[in-house]
Amino acid sequence: MNISWEMILPLIVLQLALAVFALISCIKEERTNGPKWMWAAIIVCINIIGPILFFTVGRKQR
């Protein structure tokens, strides 16, 4: 099986960037919808969708 890294590498970079940005945002937020440990687990365990869920559902509106 030959892996085309030209197609996969941008997705890996996107996933890592989203996860890091979401984790930093989760840590810095004073209040979230649900416990922070739960959001950290979702961000880390559910690729690409976890960080998107945090930004759409997890953050409290100011």
Swiss-Prot record:
Induction: Expression is sigma Y-dependent. Induced upon nitrogen starvation. Signal peptide: none annotated. The chain crosses the membrane at residues 7-27, 37-57. One of its GO terms (cellular component) is plasma membrane. It is found in: Cell membrane. It holds the Pfam family PLDc_N. Keywords: Cell membrane, Membrane, Transmembrane, Transmembrane helix. Its main location: membrane. It is a multi-pass membrane protein. Together with YxlD is important for negative regulation of sigma Y activity. This is Negative regulatory protein YxlE. The gene is yxlE.
